[in-house]
């Protein structure tokens, strides 16, 4: 393991509270029920968990906070809130007032247009932001520091500036090129990990699904879209034990 981590990197220290329980929510509306989401739901969930004595420290909002546009539907990310979230900043503030340490958001590597920011069009106009070897136009070129800076300033800061403190990265396996298919998730996970670490002025945290040798440098790893029954949970335990043996977390 020492030789492996000397080559691929070691897991960094995390904020102490990041070792606690993480809770995810669809904000009251799961897939195909997005109209049921509300910015009132996450604070109400926090309140209920506190009342029940559930000790959690991190909360993230899964996909349904995002406005799904017609270009890529739920597969793209325009960093715009759906209209059921009337006051996202107040939502973040309410969660933090209940001693939640970090609130994060699920995102995708594919940019999309929204009615306000037109992020995909702006990336096209900027040039050198999107990766030309992706299966779908719109994937950010996370190998290029300048593209990462543009993505951060024009996309992520729309949510970080009002309270998001980390992201849950999804759709990391978007490269057709075999030589980059496994490397892309590393660059994708590194970008928000380092950016939020600097912006929050604390040890970094991110959630990533895809990875490769070295992904342990940007923890955490999440297991993907699994059910809550034991038939799903048991293999996750086995998987994470193997991952731990590989020094990934």
Can you say where each PLM-predicted feature lies in the sequence?
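Catalytic-domain carbohydrate-binding cleft regions of carbohydrate-active enzymes
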Residues: 1-245, 249
């Amino acid at each position: 393991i020492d030789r492996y981590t000397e080559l691929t990197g070691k897991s960094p220290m995390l904020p102490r509270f990041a070792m606690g329980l993480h809770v995810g929510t669809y904000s009251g509306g799961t897939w195909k029920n997005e109209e049921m989401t509300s910015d009132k739901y996450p604070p109400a969930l926090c309140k209920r968990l506190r009342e029940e004595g559930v000790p959690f420290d991190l909360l993230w909002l899964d996909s349904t906070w995002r406005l799904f546009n017609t270009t890529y539907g739920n597969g793209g990310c325009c960093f715009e809130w759906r209209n059921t979230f009337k006051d996202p900043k107040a939502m973040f503030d309410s969660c933090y007032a209940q001693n939640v340490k970090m609130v994060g958001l699920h995102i995708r590597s594919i940019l999309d247009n929204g009615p306000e920011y037109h992020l995909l069009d702006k990336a096209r106009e900027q040039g050198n932001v999107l990766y030309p070897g992706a299966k779908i136009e719109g994937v950010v070129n996370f190998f290029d520091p300048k593209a990462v800076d543009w993505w951060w300033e024009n996309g992520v800061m729309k949510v970080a500036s009002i309270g998001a403190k980390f992201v849950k990265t999804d759709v990391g396996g978007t490269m057709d090129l075999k030589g980059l298919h496994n490397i892309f998730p590393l660059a994708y996970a590194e970008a928000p990990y380092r950016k939020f670490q600097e912006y929050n002025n604390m040890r970094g945290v991110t959630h990533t699904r895809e990875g490769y040798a070295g992904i342990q440098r940007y923890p955490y790893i999440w297991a993907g879209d699994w059910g809550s029954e034991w038939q799903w949970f048991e293999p996750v335990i086995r998987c994470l034990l193997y991952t731990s043996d590989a020094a990934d977390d």
